[in-house]
Amino acid sequence: MSAAVWQDGEDIILKLYIQPKASRDKIVGLHGEELKIAITAPPVDGKANAHLTK
């Protein structure tokens, strides 16, 4: 597994880099040692966090 994803017992840990206000939601790929996720929600009032957890 890469440094962005690893297993800890029964848990899988993801190290994420989130890009808010993207043109569409998608998994972009690796960004250094993090998995880059693009989301359409803006980083205002927790909207990006709420969108990511859907």
Swiss-Prot record:
Pfam families, sorted: DUF167
InterPro entries per the UniProt record, alphabetical: DUF167, YggU-like_sf
Domain of life: Bacteria
Family: Belongs to the UPF0235 family.
Protein name (Swiss-Prot/TrEMBL): UPF0235 protein in proC 3'region
Organism: Vibrio alginolyticus
